[in-house]
From Swiss-Prot:
It catalyses: alpha-D-glucosamine 1-phosphate + acetyl-CoA = N-acetyl-alpha-D-glucosamine 1-phosphate + CoA + H(+); N-acetyl-alpha-D-glucosamine 1-phosphate + UTP + H(+) = UDP-N-acetyl-alpha-D-glucosamine + diphosphate. The active site is at H361. Residues 1-227 are annotated as: Pyrophosphorylase. Residues 228-248 are annotated as: Linker. Binds 1 Mg(2+) ion per subunit. In the N-terminal section; belongs to the N-acetylglucosamine-1-phosphate uridyltransferase family. It is found in: Cytoplasm. UDP-N-acetyl-alpha-D-glucosamine binds at residues 9-12, 23, 74, 79-80, 101-103, 138, 152, 167, 225, 331, 349, 364, 375. Keywords: Acyltransferase, Cell shape, Cell wall biogenesis/degradation, Cytoplasm, Magnesium, Metal-binding, Multifunctional enzyme, Nucleotidyltransferase, Peptidoglycan synthesis, Repeat, Transferase. GO terms for cellular component: cytoplasm; membrane. One of its GO terms (molecular function) is magnesium ion binding. This is Bifunctional protein GlmU.
Length: 454
């Protein structure tokens, strides 16, 4: 099987974005456009990915530092053909070279596999798309199924203007062919640039076949040159992902008000209300219900869990039949066992909460272990930080912590203990002990409230 290398053009400045950020680093579904393209290139088993960079190259390399790409500098942006010329020295004669664009993030593995499979032994496979309104695009001229020319709008005659099949710029050819044609490109045109589309005419002159393959959807090959086009790509992507989830059995209350910025694995009878955002890798069990306005990132949610509105869960695990929210925050390292309750304005970070325990109101639990069947009252704080270091709070099983208590770590509260409301606990508590540390209540007879001065 012929090896494949991919060239991704990513040197453009993106002037119409009106941004200091390189164009290809603008995001779709929470991920830079060029990252989408790199990920797709990996899926088709590219031996090598050559990334052409220019404007904002330092930032681009910083953001993609973990990617195994060959960085190729295009110091001057003199057209698509010029960009390919910079990568040509790295091409092996006997490999296939696939040319992609860093600002066209939605191209799919399946489309690229069809394109590569269609490449003639000696020739080019060119990706095209059919448009309802092809105005402004180069028309594909065919003879006997083979592409013989790409005619730009301004050069097309009346018959050619009726053609709806247009060029996307995505193509695949052998390394030897590309090197030959790229060496013969010239910039004798109004823009003074080197156009990759000129290789189509060269291939025909050499007697090579140019095979066109049509993309099934225009948005798959659409690029983003401005914020409006970027927003259109985002909406198309979200619509596509929502439709996949609906067809897989997830109930989305309103598919137009749901965003996924990663991957979602789910069980049966999952229900997701409006304005929910999924980020990173999220796993939902069976019969999970997610209320409006929740954000879930890199988390695992067990069967029969209810997440009430406006809760945020990040890098956390929630056990079966738990109830979360509304307005709860689970931070990285939160691990909730089965049948736990976490209520409104509760924050849990780097803590384990045992089966059946309840943390229902206005509470912070951080760097802690909470046993099973505990009740943590409203306003309880685990004081885990002394300004320099963090310390752990350990709470056993069947512990009751009264409202407005402070547990100053490091501290251990053993099984069955009761902490009276308003206590400040600085020492370990033994099993079944009651701790009270409040000022004795005073009664002042005949007290008169102050009155306002007139």
């Amino acid at each position: 099987m012929t090896q494949l290398s991919v060239v991704i053009l990513a040197a453009g400045k993106g002037t119409r974005m009106y941004s200091d950020l390189p164009k290809v680093l603008h995001t779709v579904a929470g991920k830079p456009m060029v990252q989408h393209v790199i990920d797709t290139a990996k899926q088709i088993d590219a031996k090598q990915i050559h990334l052409i960079y220019g404007h904002g190259g330092e930032l681009l390399q910083q953001r993609l530092s973990s990617e195994p790409v060959n960085w190729v500098l295009q110091a001057e942006q003199l057209g698509t053909g010029h960009a390919m010329q910079q990568a040509a020295p790295f091409f092996a004669d006997d490999e296939n070279i696939l040319m992609l664009y860093g600002d066209a993030p939605l191209i799919t593995k399946e489309t690229l596999e069809r394109l590569i499979a269609a490449k003639p032994e000696n020739g080019i496979a060119l990706l095209t798309v059919e448009l309802e309104n092809p105005t402004g695009y180069g028309r594909i001229i065919r003879e006997n199924g083979s592409v013989v020319a790409i005619v730009e709008q301004k050069d097309a005659n009346a018959e050619q203007l009726k053609i709806r099949e247009v060029n996307t710029g995505v193509m695949v050819a052998s390394g030897a062919s590309f090197k030959k044609w790229l060496a013969n490109l010239n910039n004798n045109n109004a823009q003074g640039e080197y156009y990759i589309t000129d290789v189509i005419a060269m291939a025909n002159q050499d007697g090579y076949k140019v095979q066109a393959v049509q993309a099934s959807e225009f948005m798959e090959v659409e690029g983003a040159n401005n914020r409006l086009q970027l927003a259109a790509l985002e909406r198309f992507y979200q619509k596509t992902q929502a439709e996949k989830l609906l067809l897989a059995g997830v109930r989305l209350i309103d598919q137009a008000r749901f965003d996924i910025r990663g991957s979602l694995t789910h069980g049966k009878d999952v229900e997701i209300d409006v304005n929910v955002i999924i980020e990173g890798e999220v796993k939902l069990g069976n019969r999970v219900r997610i209320g409006a306005g929740c954000v879930l990132k890199n988390c695992e949610i067990g069967d029969d869990v209810e997440i009430k509105p406006y809760s945020v869960i990040e890098d956390a695990v929630v056990g079966k039949a738990a109830q979360i929210g509304p307005f709860s925050r689970l931070r990285p390292g939160a691990n909730l066992a089965e049948e736990t309750h976490v209520g409104n304005f509760v924050e849990i970070k780097n803590a384990q909460v045992g089966k059946g325990s309840k943390v229902n109101h206005l509470t912070y639990v951080g760097d802690a272990e909470v046993g099973s069947n505990c009740n943590i009252g409203a306003g309880v704080i685990t004081c885990n930080y002394d300004g320099a270091n963090k310390f752990k709070t350990i709470i056993g099983n069947n512990v009751f912590v009264g409202s407005d208590s402070q547990l100053v770590a490091p501290v251990t509260i053993a099984d069955g203990a009761t902490i009276g409301a308003g206590a400040t606990v600085t020492k370990d508590v033994a099993e079944n002990e009651l701790v009270i540390s409040r000022v004795p209540q005073r009664h002042i007879q005949g007290w008169q409230r102050p009155t306002k001065k007139k």
